Amino acid sequence: MSQRDYYEVLGVGRDADESELKKVYRKLAMKYHPDRNAGDAKAEERFKEIKEAYEVLSDSNKRAAYDQFGHAGLNGGVGGAGAQGFSDAFSDIFSDLFGMRGGGRSSVHRGADLRYNLEITLEQAARGTETKIRIPRQEACDTCHGSGAKPGTSPKTCPTCNGHGQVRMQQGFFSIQQTCSHCHGSGKIVSDPCTDCQGAGRVKRHKTLSVRIPAGVDEGDSIRLTGEGEAGASGGLAGDLYVVIHLASHPVFQREGNHLHCEIPISFTVAALGGEIEVPTLDGHARIKVPTGTQTGKIFRLRSKGITGVRNQSTGDLLCHVAVETPVNLTPRQKELLEEFESISQKDGSLHHPRAKSWMEKAREFFTE
């Protein structure tokens, strides 16, 4: 349905975690729900858009595909649900909010997300590439398999929260659940810790990963590698790794969205007489015709010679900015010819310098006012 950026729809950053997504979704969905906006077609459409965005970003697999390839990575996208999906969409949100989960359960901690800044060339960004990165991170201890307990032993149920990971506090008419301070939410107590990880269940290691960079990425884009962040505590899920793209400066091109810019120096004779010159492109070279009287600042646009974007799949243009070069290190003969040209130009009064004449006219008007 929606082709807007899902992060923009929810108003969150690309590194938003699950709790932030849920909080924002709950707020927006309750605001635009059709039951609260009866007969408001725009509110209903906005609600569907919000729900569609949340369904993608709250699913780790769909989110990873979307982060890499945009809407094209979702195999046709996710169909927006109508108001009939309200109860299903909010069941886990309300149960979290009011502590209505049945039976109680111990809390495990998801591992931290990691960020890796990766610099690539403009050519790699345009065509896509695959590269290897090495990251430091917390991984589950091989000896205790992440439990933190010495081999042959196992963690015991926390006596304070009876393994729930939370304790209930009564405040007036309200009953509030809080994380157990004894087991820190794990529901387990390690009395005989693993000697390799000192009971932490995690150890510091370096991991080499292969990262596929899709064609068309731009500065600041991030690629999410699900489960490649730090290991969770007490057997919790691992966090994610966000590889943030940075473009190295290029000796010829500057990128602006999907467009490319470059400066093309041409001789003053070609600028005056016209001609044909060769200009660089990402794919090789192209030839452009230079009309007579071309001035510095003239822009030649080569259609579809820019970059094809990773999200909208539209291809930008190459914009060539002319810089007319003044000759240096003249030979006596060259200097003589130029002096002759200048002398003839002044005698016949012809308009050989349009910008100079325009500037002189403006200056004359300024001083005679």
Swiss-Prot record:
Where does the J domain start and stop, copy by copy? 5-70
Keyword annotations for this protein?
Chaperone, Cytoplasm, DNA replication, Metal-binding, Repeat, Stress response, Zinc, Zinc-finger
Q: Which domain of life is it from?
A: Bacteria
Whereabouts are the CXXCXGXG motif repeats?
Answer: 141-148, 158-165, 180-187, 194-201
The UniProt record gives the binding positions of Zn(2+) 1 as 141, 144, 194, 197
Concerning its family, UniProt says: Belongs to the DnaJ family.
- The protein here is known as Chaperone protein DnaJ
Source organism of the structure: Nitrosomonas eutropha (strain DSM 101675 / C91 / Nm57)
- Provide the gene name from the record: dnaJ
